[in-house]
Amino acid sequence: MAIIFLVTFIGLMGFGIILPLFPFYAERMGASPEIITLTMAAFSLGQFVAAPLWGRLSDSIGRKPVLILTLLGSSLSYVILAYAPNLTVVILSRILSGLMAGNISIAFAYVTDITDDSNRAAGLGKVSAALGLGFMTGPAIGGLLAGNSVENANYLLTAWAAAGINFVAMVAAIVFLKESLDA
């Protein structure tokens, strides 16, 4: 259970790292306020479309491989964001990031697999806490990494930090996470 907490926490922390700077980054790329809003919503659209598909796939091939794939894809989406040459690539990176955000629903499915009626609520509560803690710490870390000026913010470092954190979560899942459908 501790590893799924850690993987969930790290995944949400990686997502949150870029949030405080993203509107400024998109604006620097020439986005209007409306496009910035749509670009941020692109993540949610990708997540909305992909989460049920990831869930179905994890039911058939297992939670662990799908979790690893989504964490790898999330990491890749932040690398693409780091080197996006234009606004179109920024938007595509956010859609890819959303498509790869299936790890949240998979974490809940994993906990449901490994718990019973006596400890399921506690297990799901721990995953929810990991989500909240990751989402709280990510923006704080992103703000610290960016520096003290929006004009001179280090967007590359924050995107790479998000990629790196998701990669660490993926490695942790590979090394420490047991497949729950075999449990």
List where the protein language model places each region.
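MFS 12-TM fold signature
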Residues: 43, 71-78, 165-169
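Pair of pore-lining "gating" transmembrane helices in MFS-fold secondary transporters
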Residues: 1-24
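Helix-loop-helix hairpin linking two adjacent transmembrane segments in secondary transporters
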Residues: 127-175
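Cytoplasmic helix-loop-helix junction between adjacent transmembrane helices
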Residues: 93-131
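Conserved MFS/SLC helix-loop-helix module at the cytosolic interface between two early adjacent transmembrane helices
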Residues: 48-87
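Residue-level signature of mid-helix packing/kink "hotspots" within the transmembrane helices
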Residues: 16, 44-52, 102, 135-136
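Flexible cytoplasmic inter-helical loops of multi-pass small-molecule transporters
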Residues: 174-183
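Hydrophobic core of transmembrane alpha-helices in multi-pass small-molecule transporters
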Residues: 9, 77, 88-102
